[in-house]
């Protein structure tokens, strides 16, 4: 059961049985909290222009995401899990555009199963994948940030659970996420656009009954909440 870890959001992945794309800080933590809040689905797009075009067609859809880490003018929400956790998303469809996680997911569609996750849903996702796999399964894990240890720590944590080696513990992953270069700006009082409480949400492991799987048979790849 070969499991490869890739870092960054621009890969040409060979066909695989399972791809897992990680964005801890913050895209797929935001997505996780959106589904906890009742969201129906999350459409993934590469650009703000694509997001606005979809919004024109579906005015009730909620735009969420970022460019260069900050919220996009004209979007309904930014990329903050703290803010998402305070929203009622019952039966809402979202459109998400982010620099790393969404871009990486859209580059990882060449798989029978594509899952996305942050750390908050990493254990649940890994345990679900472990039940799916056979000895000859090809699995790719994509740590979507090009250099940050946050996504890499989560990738190694997930890989260890699937393999049964548990080489990285949850506590170790949390410390690496908090200590990563990506997290630094959230603790910098000179950068008020980045809220340190977001890192609390990004490092809280939740027990859940669903995974986030990307549905690929429509015009726009869409994350769905799949009960396990």
UniProtKB/Swiss-Prot annotation:
Belongs to the ComB family. InterPro entries: ComB-like, ComB-like_sf. Its cofactor is Mg(2+). One of its GO terms (molecular function) is 2-phosphosulfolactate phosphatase activity. PANTHER family: 2-PHOSPHOSULFOLACTATE PHOSPHATASE-RELATED (PTHR37311:SF1). Its EC number is 3.1.3.71. Coiled coil: none annotated. It holds the Pfam family 2-ph_phosp. Keywords: Hydrolase, Magnesium. The gene is comB. This is Probable 2-phosphosulfolactate phosphatase.
């Amino acid at each position: 059961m070969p499991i490869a870890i890739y870092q960054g959001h621009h890969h040409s992945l060979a066909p695989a049985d399972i791809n897992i794309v990680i964005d801890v800080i913050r895209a797929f933590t935001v997505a996780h909290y959106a589904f906890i809040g009742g969201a129906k689905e999350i459409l993934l797009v590469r650009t703000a222009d694509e997001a606005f075009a979809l919004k024109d067609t579906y005015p009730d859809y909620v735009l969420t995401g970022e460019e260069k880490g900050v919220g996009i003018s004209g979007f309904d929400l930014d990329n903050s899990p703290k803010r998402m956790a305070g929203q009622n998303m019952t039966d809402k469809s979202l459109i998400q555009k982010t620099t790393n996680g969404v871009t990486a997911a859209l580059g990882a569609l060449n798989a029978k199963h594509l899952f996305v996750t942050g750390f908050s849903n990493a254990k649940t996702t890994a345990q679900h994948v472990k039940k799916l796999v056979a000895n000859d399964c090809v699995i790719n894990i994509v740590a979507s940030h090009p250099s940050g240890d946050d996504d890499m720590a989560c990738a190694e944590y997930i890989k260890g659970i699937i393999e049964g080696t548990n080489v990285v513990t949850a506590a170790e992953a949390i410390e690496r996420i908090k200590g990563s270069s990506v997290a630094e700006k959230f603790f910098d009082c000179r950068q008020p656009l980045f809220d340190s409480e977001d890192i609390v949400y990004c490092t809280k492991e939740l027990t859940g009954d669903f995974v986030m799987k990307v549905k690929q048979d429509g015009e726009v790849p869409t994350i769905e909440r799949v009960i396990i």
